[in-house]
């Protein structure tokens, strides 16, 4: 399927989330006959808006009309086990993701970024650097995808010479078929969302690897060489595209390294075709909400992307120096009673929690918990034992966390996030850090990690001096 062949096609879009709605409007605008099919309910205003855009709408279930189509677009939140998905597959209907559909109409160069952790920060940083470079040439950079704005909602405004920075989840990549980024990035792969993949890391990784499955000569894959799974898969063998590893360690053969980005004595170094150049010092950009070992990885990835896009080192240095981090990722909230309060609501897995604990110096009151995803907390036990004075567990997993960290740190269960904030205020001493890094999903108490983080910040900012 291509953008030229959708006119007149009968299409269903399963799921009326943001990306599903955007895909439906895009396809209808390109001449397809589109039915947006939603299992839940839709508001009358939303239905009317969609109809004005030429989109047919049904809610409360999926009818025969949603199955009698030429192809279907499945929203990322719809699991493969959903009855509508199964019914479409049984009929041999081709299923696509919203990302795939948007790519058919994209005139901009595409940077696709995925990974378990770091993809939002890396995508935001790459976007900011590309936007600064684009402003010098009269072009634009667009931050879309899992970062918050659907690719399909913006693709019609993109021009040749623009840069689309697309953050991609494994869910969004599952139904990609022809999607081909000019530059793809794999930040890391650690256990997460395994329930969707029947507990299989292999299936989860395979979904992530789809980001580069269509890349060819002239395209670039950037990957974290310190991630053993990624290095094993991409470090050897033959691939049609250029591979650029990034690492905190200087390669033994750095002097003759063809392509790569690494850290040497606090400086980010780019190696290419036997030569190398220094781009930026880490002490020039690590600060406040953008600090820690994991953010050096994010910076390395962004530098590698910038090099692949031909962005000048001066623009890259300025972009790194100006970057303030992203909301809900180790975000400084305030200092109260001599203690720093940090919002890390985006830490929805154990590895992200580990990164936050590594980044904080001094004594910590840790607020953690939510909806557990089959987490293995053993990797963070040494850090918790070393740094955490009090662990306040919340949400569905509060008893599970209390058991997992029993004997490692002092633990207290809190009935709510507000209660945890009050307990943390009473416990935190001068020079301590109150770190909200849940390590779990948010869906037990909140719609998403953004709502959870906003609520935490509201609670903290309501505390009196």
Curated annotation (Swiss-Prot):
GO function terms (MF aspect)? ATP binding; UDP-N-acetylmuramoylalanine-D-glutamate ligase activity
Q: What class of enzyme is it?
A: ligase
What GO CC terms are in its UniProt record? cytoplasm
Annotated localization: Cytoplasm
Q: Gene3D superfamilies recorded for this chain?
A: Mur ligase, C-terminal domain, Mur-like, catalytic domain, NAD(P)-binding Rossmann-like Domain
* Record keywords: ATP-binding, Cell cycle, Cell division, Cell shape, Cell wall biogenesis/degradation, Cytoplasm, Ligase, Nucleotide-binding, Peptidoglycan synthesis
| Catalytic reactions of this protein | UDP-N-acetyl-alpha-D-muramoyl-L-alanine + D-glutamate + ATP = UDP-N-acetyl-alpha-D-muramoyl-L-alanyl-D-glutamate + ADP + phosphate + H(+)
Q: Quote the EC number.
A: 6.3.2.9
- Which residues participate in ATP binding? 115-121
**Pathway annotation:** Cell wall biogenesis; peptidoglycan biosynthesis
Q: What are its GO biological-process terms?
A: cell division; cell wall organization; peptidoglycan biosynthetic process; regulation of cell shape
Record function comment = Cell wall formation. Catalyzes the addition of glutamate to the nucleotide precursor UDP-N-acetylmuramoyl-L-alanine (UMA).
Family membership, please give it. Belongs to the MurCDEF family.
Q: What is this protein called?
A: UDP-N-acetylmuramoylalanine--D-glutamate ligase
Species source reads: Chlorobium phaeovibrioides (strain DSM 265 / 1930) (Prosthecochloris vibrioformis (strain DSM 265))
């Amino acid at each position: 399927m291509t953008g030229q062949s959708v006119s007149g096609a009968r299409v269903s879009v399963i799921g009326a989330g943001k990306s599903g709605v955007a895909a439906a409007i895009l396809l209808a605008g390109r001449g397809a006959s589109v039915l947006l099919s939603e299992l839940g309910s839709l508001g009358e205003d939303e239905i009317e808006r969609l109809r004005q855009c030429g989109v047919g709408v049904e809610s409360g279930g999926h009818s025969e009309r949603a199955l009698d189509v030429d192809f279907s677009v499945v929203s990322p939140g719809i699991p493969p086990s959903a009855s509508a998905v199964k019914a479409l597959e049984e009929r041999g209907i081709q299923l696509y993701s919203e990302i795939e559909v948007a790519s058919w109409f994209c005139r901009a160069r595409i940077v696709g970024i995925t990974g378990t952790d770091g993809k939002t920060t890396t995508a935001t940083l790459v976007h900011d650097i590309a936007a600064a470079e684009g402003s010098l040439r009269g072009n634009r950079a667009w931050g879309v995808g899992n970062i918050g704005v659907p690719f399909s909602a913006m693709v019609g405004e993109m021009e040749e010479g623009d840069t689309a920075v697309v953050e991609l989840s494994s869910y969004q990549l599952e139904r990609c078929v022809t999607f081909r980024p000019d530059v793809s990035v794999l930040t890391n792969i650690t256990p997460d969302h395994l329930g969707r993949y029947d507990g299989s890391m292999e299936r989860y990784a395979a979904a992530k690897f789809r980001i580069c499955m269509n890349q060819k000569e002239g395209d670039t894959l950037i990957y974290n060489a310190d991630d053993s799974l990624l290095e094993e898969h991409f470090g050897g063998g033959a691939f049609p595209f250029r591979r650029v590893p990034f690492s905190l360690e200087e390669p033994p053969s750095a002097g003759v390294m063809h392509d790569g980005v690494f850290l040497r004595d606090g400086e980010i170094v780019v190696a290419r075709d036997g030569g190398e150049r220094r781009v930026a010092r880490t002490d020039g950009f690590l600060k406040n909400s953008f600090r820690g070992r994991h953010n050096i990885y994010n910076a390395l990835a962004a530098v590698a992307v910038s090099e692949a896009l031909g962005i000048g080192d001066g623009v890259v240095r300025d972009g790194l120096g100006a970057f303030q981090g992203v909301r809900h990722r180790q975000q400084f909230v305030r200092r109260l009673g001599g203690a720093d309060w940090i919002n890390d609501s985006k830490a929805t897995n154990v590895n992200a929690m580990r990164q936050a604990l590594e980044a904080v110096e001094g004594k910590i009151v840790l607020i953690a918990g939510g909806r557990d995803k089959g987490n293995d907390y053993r990797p963070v036990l040494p850090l918790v034992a070393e740094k955490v004075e009090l662990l306040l567990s919340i949400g569905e997993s509060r008893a599970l966390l209390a058991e997992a960290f029993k004997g490692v740190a002092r633990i207290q269960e809190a009935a709510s996030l507000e209660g945890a904030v009050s307990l943390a205020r009473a416990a935190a001493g001068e020079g301590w850090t109150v770190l909200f890094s849940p390590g779990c999903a948010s869906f037990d108490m909140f719609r998403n990690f953004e709502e959870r983080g906003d609520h935490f910040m509201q609670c903290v900012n309501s505390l009196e001096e």
